[in-house]
Amino acid sequence: MKKLFLDTNVWLRFILEDNEQAKGCRELITQIEAGRWRVYTSAIVLLEVNYVLNSVYKIKVSEAIEDIEAILKTRNLTLIEKTDFRKALKFYRQTKIKLTDCLIAAQVPPKIILVSYDQDFKKLPVRVKTPGELL
């Protein structure tokens, strides 16, 4: 079973279904639920999901909690909570991209594909693909 790490924007497109990227995210998560992929995400990703839902989309806290709980119930999901902050700072120093993205990149286990639409991750030493590139 291939392994993937899902970034914030993949979960948001799946939850919100607000643009053309949502279809690919929905298809990918359907495949994850069916057992085709082993998936990882992190507490930092879920924190970003919560922030965007509350601050950008003005979704009620209770609804955001339900959405995050639904993510946590995803079949074949492992939540990564450990972070190598020194590694993230090194990435941040080298690239000047968002520190949260550097933290996420530092959490991606070796040989695992980071699934994201965020092009900044291509500046970091992680393998990055969009959902469409995996389907």
Predicted regions and their residues:
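Alpha-helix N-cap and coil->helix boundary residues
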Residues: 20-24, 40-44, 59, 63-66, ...
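Active-site neighborhoods of divalent-metal-dependent phosphate/nucleic-acid chemistry enzymes
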Residues: 76-113, 117
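Short amphipathic alpha-helical segments and helix-helix/interface helices
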Residues: 26-29, 68, 104-105, 118
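Acidic, PIN/NYN-like endoribonuclease modules and their adjacent C-terminal/linker elements
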Residues: 1-3, 74, 105-106, 110-135
